[in-house]
From Swiss-Prot:
This is DNA polymerase catalytic subunit. Belongs to the DNA polymerase type-B family. It is found in: Host nucleus. The lineage of its organism: Viruses, Duplodnaviria, Heunggongvirae, Peploviricota, Herviviricetes. One of its GO terms (molecular function) is nucleotide binding. Its EC number is 2.7.7.7. GO terms for cellular component: host cell nucleus. It is an enzyme of class 2 (transferase). It comes from the Viruses. It catalyses: DNA(n) + a 2'-deoxyribonucleoside 5'-triphosphate = DNA(n+1) + diphosphate. GO terms for biological process: DNA-templated DNA replication; viral DNA genome replication. Keywords: DNA replication, DNA-binding, DNA-directed DNA polymerase, Host nucleus, Nucleotidyltransferase, Transferase, Viral DNA replication.
């Protein structure tokens, strides 16, 4: 493909139409290679030509009319230019909602809204914008009026609320911009056990800003305020029994007229009152929401791209768009800077400058009805980069490119402490009307891999690979011309397609929507805003129904408490079965079983205030911080337990339904629903235990962990007292076992016990484990606490807390806290260590030898030698040494790599191995690595006395010149890799293990 670049030739291609808006001057940055093939650098160009692109060879304007429509606008519509219908005649409307945005209208908007709602915004009023799609799949924004926003206040005796508010109005100039009213009511405060409600005022305010103003003034006057942190969207959902995601109908939706009245860039826009809406909870299907997966390719002239440098342009943005839930193939689009050859299956839009490319991308987000946006590390790189280029280089106002006009936001909020570095600190993408899903963060949470590069994750999950293009090739391919850009474009599109495949693999969009529904929060907040807001919204709901109001915590109680502890492990190698039992949902069931809650708690020194309570009315827990009491269910119901009961009953019903459903789409939604409930249940304990949280109560959290420890200890005592005869009584049958058969707990980890079943065979343990766990549940605990048999190991290497390796009865190897594939180890060491582990876990003779070694002192092993079976391990070590000595290990298997994280001049020490290699490459006048490149190196044979770093060499150079490796150094890594997993055989000391392994390795005398 080719086109005339309008900024490099004196020619006008588009017919001049009558101007619909004032002429605007644009400054563009043009790559020099557009005029001189292969040239680096850029040139600025200023003109009044509007943004354009080329589709094929046809020049196409990007913006239409007054700029509120673009080439992506469906049917020529786009926002403020058109209306949803004629007149203000109400119509019936059915629509699905995926996002809720809160905004404030002032009286200056009266001409834009139907007459019946004008008084609601004088002098100002809250409007909720419900974004979604209609039943015929058209994008829609429904502006909801008359949703009341309120908080509660308790006024000290002797003071009048009227007087306090008037005083507040005199002290604040902005007071006239809002309106308020109040009513007297009675409520209980959700802080501790309380029998009688107390008099409070419910204060209604026209906006959240006005709530803050009133609350600030009343607090300063000595009043106590409640629920000032509850926004209008949350009131809308909770007070009306609505949802943040799902189907609604409206009997009287008034079409919003076109022109300046339009307040969104959806195809349709309506106004209605909150009371006109009805939510359809039983309908679970989705409309055709669009999911956009995008990726950018940048030019990094001096290493890693820097968005503030003019030369570091965005070269391409690939956009793969999928209609969620449909079987249609996704639409692949490439926004390309410069000319580009055709790419099969891809729509190529050629842009004469980066500014045109940015306009094309941002108008796509605004006008192409995109509801979900995904990518890989878009929170930390892609979105910040395009935003910085647009705002810092071109001074674009990105608020003009979201789905709404009022309360528009298009930003990335970076964490305050982002010193963790690239791809480590997590930022929040905030684009009004768009749900961002960063699949890098999702994959980090769901997977356990040696690295989380897209190529690695895609290979693991969907069996696909990236296109083979090194980012070092990007500048060359771009300047090569249309053919090079096409190759780069295919690479870019493939990345976006892989990310979309990952999203569909995990069904993340469905999962977060189900969590949003359960937690009563907007979908866009699920991935970024943590667990606290989920539980808070639900607690607010159930508390309101029971006549409670929630205090606004000031975080004065910041003392810590003893968290979950473990039963210390007994390290060693266990060659007889180890049964692992765990408590199903331990912390939630403790809350349920013991009626724990703010509403049932009585601090130890306040029991005297409740003389009507007898000893049988409450349960006492002697905590490290002092006693605390919780009243029993017949006196007061735990609101937290009520939440958990409802959620778990719903999850049970969903799982029953799941077993009978065959439709895959329905199965996916049901599965994500039950998963959402599980995740939210597990967040309840954490909600109370975070001192800086929304409503912390460390006494509750401490009680939960205290009871959890007590349950583990009781279980340990009970199981260790079960004899073969006792087991026969429990099972109602005798189990053939060794005379000295016994059960011993060798490790306890928060909610699980590792039970060494000495004298029993693995298949026997598998046969009776469920019955044993059920018996312990009935004997020791109250409903709904339940102990379950989780798994059985045939043999187990137990190292330390949270570090073990076990061979399950299915012959699958399970590792916890032990990573054989690490960035700090080369492939040769990893593979040798894995071979030793497989031998120890899989060979009966070696297993028996390992068990005997555990019972021997290190001195005894050195004096008498290891058991014969263990010599097979020594053979592997000796074989690895011979391979190193004879230079038979490929250089690639001996290579390490370290990232060049900053310019070479910024390093304080240059003796790091990868920096030594950097300087060697520089001395040889070879191409230098760039910032954020991983520099590979091997350690090669050198004269004795040299520093280890000086032994570092470029792997390619070492292979080319057949330089032998540093044998002793690599063998030492092999020894310590093996010692790391075998330390439990040698008094659980890795240094002693390494000494023993060296002692029996067959090394030449000069190497000992």
């Amino acid at each position: 493909m080719s086109f005339y670049n309008p900024y490099l030739v004196k020619r006008t291609f588009l017919k001049k139409a009558a101007p619909s808006r004032p002429t605007k001057e644009y400054t563009r940055i043009i790559p020099k290679c557009f005029k001189t093939p292969g040239a680096a650098g850029v040139v600025p160009h200023t003109s009044t030509l509007d943004p354009v692109c080329f589709v094929g060879d046809k020049e196409t304007p990007i913006l239409y009319g007054d700029g509120s429509r673009s080439l992506w606008s469906a049917g020529g519509r786009g926002g403020p230019g058109t209306g949803a219908g004629q007149g203000h005649t109400p119509v019936a409307l059915t629509f699905h909602v995926y996002d809720i945005i809160e905004t404030v209208y002032g009286q200056d908007r009266c001409d834009h809204v139907p007459f019946q709602f004008q008084t609601d915004i004088i002098p100002s009023g809250t409007v909720l914008k419900l974004l979604g799609r209609t039943s015929d799949d058209r994008s829609v924004c429904v502006n909801v009026f008359r949703q009341e926003l309120y908080f509660y206040v308790r006024v000290p005796e002797g003071l009048k609320l009227d007087f306090l508010i008037q005083q507040c109005s005199r002290e604040n100039f902005n007071f006239s911009q809002g309106r308020y009213r109040y009513e007297k009511t009675s409520k209980r405060v959700l802080r501790e056990y309380c029998v009688e409600a107390r008099e409070v005022y419910r204060v209604f305010a026209s906006s959240q800003g006005f709530v803050d103003l009133l609350a600030g003034g009343l607090t300063a006057a000595g009043c106590e305020v409640f629920e000032t942190n509850v926004d209008a969207a949350r009131r809308f959902i909770i007070d009306n029994g609505f949802s943040t995601f799902g189907w609604y109908s409206c009997a009287a939706a008034v079409p919003r007229q076109g022109g300046a009245a339009r307040d969104s860039w959806t195809e349709l826009e309506y106004d209605c009152a909150a009371g006109d809406l009805e939510f359809h909870a039983g309908r679970a299907d989705w409309p055709g929401y669009n999911v956009l997966s995008f990726d950018i390719e940048c030019l990094g002239e001096n290493g890693f791209p820097n968005a503030s440098r003019d030369e570091d342009m965005i070269l391409q943005i690939s956009c793969v768009i999928w209609k969620a839930g449909s079987g249609e193939a996704p639409r692949s689009v490439l926004l390309n800077l410069g000319t580009c050859e055709e790419i099969e299956g891809v729509e190529v839009y050629q842009c004469p400058s980066e500014l045109d490319l940015l306009y094309l991308f941002f108008t796509m987000i605004r006008d192409a009805d995109v509801e979900f946006v995904t990518g890989y590390n878009i929170s930390n790189f892609d979105f910040p980069y395009v935003i910085d280029r647009a705002t810092q280089v071109y001074n674009l106002n990105l608020k003009e490119f979201t789905r709404v006009r009022s309360s528009s936001i298009f930003e990335v909020h970076k964490p305050k402490n982002s010193s963790a570095g690239f791809m480590r600190a997590v930022s929040k993408v905030k684009v009004a009307g768009v749900v961002p899903i960063d699949m890098y963060q999702v994959c980090r949470d769901k997977l356990s891999l040696s690295n989380y590069k897209l190529d690695t994750v895609a290979g693991e999950c969907v069996g696909a690979k990236k296109e083979d293009v090194s980012y070092k090739e990007i500048p060359h391919l771009f300047r090569q011309g249309p053919g090079g850009r096409a190759r780069l474009g295919l690479y870019c599109v493939k990345d976006s397609a892989l990310v979309l495949d990952l999203l569909r693999y995990f069904m993340t969009h469905v999962e977060i929507s189900e969590i949003a529904k359960i937690a009563k929060i907007p979908t866009r907040r699920v991935l970024t805003d943590g667990q606290q807001i989920r539980v808070f919204s639900c607690l607010l709901d159930v508390a309101g129904r029971e006549g409670y109001i929630l205090p606004v915590d000031r975080h004065a109680d910041a003392e810590g408490y003893q968290g979950a502890t473990v039963i210390d492990p007994s390290p060693g190698f266990y060659n007889t079965p180890v049964l692992v039992v765990d408590f199903a949902s331990l912390y939630p069931t403790i809350i349920q079983a013991h009626n724990l809650c703010y509403s049932t708690m009585i601090p130890g020194d306040r029991l005297c205030l409740h003389p009507h309570l007898g000893p049988g009315d409450y349960e006492t827990f002697e905590l490290a911080s002092g006693p605390v009491h919780f009243v029993k269910k017949h006196k007061a119901v735990s609101l937290l337990a009520t939440l958990l009961n409802v959620w778990l009953a719903k999850r049970k019903a969903i799982r029953r339904e799941l077993a009978t459903v065959s439709d895959e789409a329905v199965r996916t939604i049901l599965d994500k629903q039950q998963l959402a409930i599980k995740v939210t249940c597990n967040a309840v304990y954490g909600f109370t235990g975070v001192a800086s949280g929304i409503l912390p109560c460390l006494k509750i959290a401490e009680t939960v962990t205290f009871q959890g420890r007590r349950m583990l200890e009781n279980s340990k005592r009970y199981i260790e007292g079960v004899t073969p005869e006792g087991l026969a009584d429990i099972l109602g049958r005798r189990v053939e076992c060794a005379p000295d058969a016994s059960f011993k707990v060798i490790y306890g980890d928060t909610d699980s016990l590792f039970i060494h079943c000495r004298g029993y065979r693995p298949e026997q343990v598998t046969g009776f484990c469920d019955e044993l766990a059920a018996h312990m549940t009935r004997t020791l605990f109250v409903d709904p606490i339940k102990l379950e048999a989780e798994k059985t190991f045939k043999c187990l290497i137990l190292l330390t807390k949270k570090r073990y390796i076990g061979m399950m009865t299915t012959d699958r190897l399970l590792m916890k806290g032990v990573d054989l594939v690490r960035k700090t180890a080369c492939r040769f060491v990893q593979e040798t260590t894995k071979a030793i582990l497989d031998l120890v876990m899989g060979d009966e003779a070696v297993r028996a030898a390992a068990e005997r070694l555990c019972a021997m002192r290190v001195e005894e092993v050195c004096a008498r030698g290891p058991p014969v079976g263990f010599l097979k391990v020594v053979d592997i070590l000796n074989d690895s040494y011979r391979k190193l000595r004879l230079n038979r290990v490929p250089v690639g298997q001996l290579s390490f790599s370290t990232e060049l994280s900053r310019p070479i001049s910024y390093y304080k020490t240059l003796t790091l191995p990868h920096l030594v290699v950097y300087h060697k490459i520089m001395q040889r006048n070879e191409e230098l690595p760039q910032i954020h490149d991983r520099i590979a190196y091997v350690f090669v044979q050198s004269p004795k006395g040299k520093l280890r770093s000086e032994m570092a060499e470029d792997p390619a150079y070492a292979a080319q010149h057949n330089i032998p490796p540093a044998v002793d150094l690599y063998f030492d890594k092999v020894i310590h890799g093996a010692a790391n997993i075998l330390q439990c055989l040698f008094e659980n000391d890795s240094d002693k293990a390494a000494r023993v392994l060296y002692n029996f390795a067959d090394l030449p005398p000069d190497d000992l």
